């Protein structure tokens, strides 16, 4: 008996995998025929997060002590699509005093992103952080963020849970399959359904409003 859970959020497409654990925000009832596996629906959410043993209580958002509204995404650079960059660039244009913090260690991707943001005229508003030395340094960076932006169509999971644990709100956009609905499921089950956008225009609107 083989059951698929975290790590590969889709059908394996082969007969040797028997079950896939999901929830009804990720795989709709009328989509079960698209999966080789039988779907095990968990009540509420398919994911679990035990929390972090780190100080997370602070009284105000960074923008309350600054003229700058700070957006952030610590998702793996491989999840940042060109479409995502275009939407983020539009947001940076619409919010006058704003900046976007990105963090990873993939130099090649950073070069590509810089070229893309430069083309959109917002590179000066994007801050690239190197990979953190340790987990505590990584998680404390959330204290510098007013609002986290989820990637699409491949949404975040760990980074979304981390942000919410650190009391930082997250905007996500629901998509067309398991991978692109993870952010939606986490937010809905955190009683934050208003932070889920149905399309790019709504995503932008929710951030800039």
Predicted regions located by residue number:
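Proline-centered loop/turn at the N-terminus of a beta-strand
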Residues: 1, 99, 167-169
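Active-site-proximal region of nucleotide-activated glycan assembly enzymes
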Residues: 1-57, 61
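Generic beta-strand/beta-sheet core signal
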Residues: 5, 22-23, 74, 103, ...
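Short, conserved active-site loop motifs that form the nucleotide-linked donor/cofactor pocket
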Residues: 18, 39, 126-127, 193-194
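Conserved catalytic-core segment of nucleotide-activated headgroup transferases in glycan assembly
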Residues: 44-137, 141-143
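Acidic donor-binding loop of glycosyltransferase active sites
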Residues: 141-154
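Catalytic binding pocket for nucleotide-activated donors in carbohydrate/polymer assembly enzymes
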Residues: 151-209
